[in-house]
Regions:
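Active-site mouth loops of central-metabolism enzymes
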Residues: 81-94, 146-163, 214-219
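C-terminal cap of metal-dependent C-N hydrolases
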Residues: 34, 346-348, 365-402
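Histidine/acidic-residue-rich catalytic or RNA/ligand-binding cores of hydrolases
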Residues: 76-79, 186, 225-233, 250, ...
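Metal-associated gating/positioning segment near the N- to mid-region
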Residues: 59-126, 223, 231
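Divalent metal-dependent hydrolysis catalytic cores, especially in the metallo-beta-lactamase
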Residues: 93-122, 131-142, 173-186, 213-214, ...
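Histidine/acidic residue-rich metal-binding segments in metalloenzymes
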Residues: 160-239, 243-264, 287-308, 341, ...
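N-terminal metal-binding scaffold of metallo-dependent hydrolase/deaminase domains
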Residues: 1-48, 60-61, 376-381, 396-397
Length: 402
C-alpha cells in the first residue's frame, strides 16, 4: 500500500480505471482518508479490514476532471460577459456558487478561471471540500477598448503593462492572462487582428516570469498565435489559427509550439443541444468556418505533439455553459486523438498546465481525493463521460447515484 490509511478510510473500486496518464484495464481500488488519497491498489486487491468500499460494476474510475478555461462570473446567459460590470457583489457570488456546483455535478473537481471582474474569483479561491479547486488569473490584460475590456484589465504603454503584471502579482493570482488578439464575444474588436506588438507581449511575459507567474495568451489568428509563441508564453487559449481561408496552423508553427512545451487549450466543447449565439454563428458562416474544418487543424496540433488540454470557455453563453467539459474530451477524441491522450488533457496534463500537479489530476497517494466514476467504459465509448455516477471532491462525495 502506498501509505498507511487511518481509521476513516473509504475505498472506491472500479472494473476499469484511468490514472491520469494510462488506462488500467484490470481496474483499481483507491483508498481515501479525509481529503487525500492514501492508497492506489490493483482492482483485485482486498480492502483493509472494516473499510467500506463503493463498487459500481461496469464502471470506470478516473481522476476528477479539470476545466482549464472557465469564467465563473459568467452566468451562461446571452449577455454573460456584457453584464459583468453591472452585477452586484451578491449576484456575482451567487453566479460563482452556481457555476462551481454545475462543474462538480459534471465530474469537474478543479477549474482555472481566466477572466473575472473586480477580482471576484481571484479573491475567493478558498473553496470547501466537496467543491472544485479554483485557480485564477483575475481580469485579463487587454488594450483600451479591447477584448473583454469591461473586466477591468485595460493597460497600455510600457509602464502601464508593467504595473498590470505587478498588480496581479500583488493580488496573488496563479497565472497571468493577456488578450493577444480580438475576440468574438466583444463587439468592436477585430478577432483577426493582434492587440499588442511583439515587443509588448515580450515585456508582459518577461514581467510575469520575473514574478514567478506563468502566462497564457488568448489568440485566434495565426499572426497572434505566432507572436505569442515568439514572446515565450506558457499557454495559448483557443489557438484557432483563423486565416482568410479558414482554420489552418502552419506545420512549422505547430512543431514550434510542441518543442516549446506550450500548453494549448483549444476551448472545445459546448452543449450539443443549444445553438451557438447568433453573432458568433454569423461570423462562422461568413468565414465558412465549420467543425469539419476545425477538426484537421486540431489533429495537426495533436500529431505534432502539442500539449493539448481541456477547457470549454465555460460560462460565456448558453452553448458554453458551466458543466459541459465532457463534451470537450468527446470532441478531441472525434479529431482522432487517443482516448488516453484526451483524458490526460482533462486530468494530469491540465493539472500540469494549471499549476496543480502537486495537488490533483492523478490517482496517486498524497494527492487530493478528487475522483470521478462514470457508468460504462470511455475507452470503448467516450460518451460514458456524460454519465457520472460518483464524484468525490477532496474526499467529499459531491455526487452519488450509487
Amino acid at each position: 500500500m502506498s501509505s498507511r490509511p487511518g481509521s476513516g478510510v473509504h475505498g472506491y473500486r472500479a472494473d476499469v480505471a484511468f490514472d491520469g496518464e494510462r488506462e488500467l484495464p484490470d481496474g483499481v481500488l483507491v483508498l481515501v482518508d479525509g481529503e487525500l488519497i492514501v492508497g492506489v491498489e490493483p482492482g483485485s486487491a482486498a480492502a483493509p479490514a472494516d473499510c467500506p468500499v463503493t463498487h459500481l460494476r461496469g464502471s470506470t474510475l478516473l481522476p476528477g476532471l479539470i476545466d482549464a478555461h472557465v469564467h465563473l462570473c459568467g452566468d451562461s446567459g446571452d449577455r454573460a460577459l456584457d453584464q459583468l460590470p453591472s452585477l452586484s457583489d451578491t449576484d456575482r457570488d451567487e453566479i460563482i456558487h452556481r457555476a462551481l456546483s454545475a462543474h462538480v455535478q459534471s465530474g469537474v473537481t478543479a477549474v482555472r478561471d481566466l477572466g473575472d471582474v473586480d477580482w471576484a474569483v481571484a479573491d475567493h479561491r478558498d473553496t470547501a471540500p466537496g467543491q472544485p479547486h479554483v485557480v485564477a488569473s483575475g481580469p485579463p490584460i487587454t488594450i483600451a477598448g479591447g477584448h473583454c475590456a469591461n473586466m477591468g484589465g485595460e493597460a497600455s504603454g510600457r509602464d502601464g503593462l508593467i504595473r498590470a503584471v505587478q498588480q496581479r502579482a500583488e493580488r496573488g493570482v496563479d497565472i497571468v492572462k493577456i488578450m493577444a488578439s480580438g475576440g468574438l464575444m466583444t463587439v468592436g474588436t477585430d478577432v483577426m487582428a493582434s492587440q499588442f506588438t511583439l515587443e509588448e507581449l515580450r515585456l508582459v511575459v518577461d514581467q510575469a516570469h520575473r514574478q514567478g507567474l506563468p502566462i497564457t495568451a488568448h489568440a485566434h489568428p495565426v499572426p497572434a498565435v505566432r507572436q505569442a509563441v515568439e514572446a515565450g508564453v506558457d499557454g495559448i487559449e483557443h489557438c484557432t489559427c483563423f486565416t482568410a481561408a479558414g482554420f489552418h496552423i502552419p506545420p512549422q508553427l505547430a512543431e514550434r509550439i510542441a518543442a516549446s512545451g506550450i500548453f494549448v487549450c483549444p476551448t472545445l466543447g459546448r452543449d450539443p443541444g443549444v445553438p451557438v449565439p447568433p453573432r458568433i454563428q454569423a461570423f462562422l458562416e461568413r468565414m465558412g468556418l465549420t467543425w469539419e474544418l476545425r477538426r484537421p487543424q486540431i489533429r495537426a496540433m495533436y500529431d505534432a505533439g502539442v500539449a493539448l488540454i481541456a477547457g470549454v470557455d465555460s460560462g460565456i453563453n448558453p452553448a458554453k455553459r458551466h458543466g459541459v467539459l465532457p463534451e470537450a474530451v468527446i470532441e478531441l477524441v472525434d479529431t482522432g486523438a487517443s482516448v488516453s491522450a484526451a483524458l490526460g488533457g482533462a486530468t494530469s496534463r491540465a493539472a500540469d498546465a494549471c499549476g496543480l500537479a502537486g495537488r490533483t489530476g492523478r490517482l496517486r497517494a498524497g494527492l487530493a481525493a478528487d475522483l470521478l466514476i462514470v457508468d460504462g467504459n470511455p475507452f470503448t465509448d467516450i460518451t460514458a463521460l456524460r454519465t457520472p455516477v460518483t464524484v468525490v471532491a477532496r474526499g467529499v462525495q459531491a455526487v452519488s447515484q450509487a
